[in-house]
Amino acid sequence: MIDSAFYFDLASPLAYLAAEQVLAGLGGPAAWQPILASRLPTAEPFGAAARQDVQRRAEQLGLQPVRWPAGFPFDSELAMRVATYAREIGRAVPFAQAAFRQAFAGGHDLSDPDFVLIAAAACEMHPRAVLAAAQRESIREQLRAATAAAIEAGVRAVPAIRVADSVFEGERAIEDARAALTAAAAVTRS
């Protein structure tokens, strides 16, 4: 198997667009890794021009129009702790998909625990277990460690896809990541 990961933060509309493309057939990566974008070296504010670009890109990808959460940008730490728990129990992809869609297709603020729980319920995660896990120090530490490891691997922004030692950042880098995965798979087969 090719060593690869998709790094995301549920507060990132660009990660939402990238996640939809990864789900639509990137052919990998093997691991979906939640990290805190606010701790990355290049965390930047998201202005009006960037919102318009996201709207245009969503349309190009055939997604419904983006509905911006009223509190955007929202504090994603609770949602990211739940994403870390979801990864721990093998539900990272369905939880991330449901949460991204809650935020950017539904226009819901993921700093509100109710919307995080709706996303969790959509992928069969029990609300009491989710709330308990989100408060565990071990989950907080896993998220901090994953963010630090991503930075160490060269991730400076989300979304990012790592294929072996190469990191591809930004929603529009999906094609570069796809080519790297294809090349790595060809080398693995030979």
Regions inferred by a protein language model and the residue ranges of each:
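Structural alpha/beta surface segment adjacent to cysteine/selenocysteine redox centers
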Residues: L10-A103
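C-terminal cap of thioredoxin/glutaredoxin-like
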Residues: S4-F6, L10-G28, R101-S190
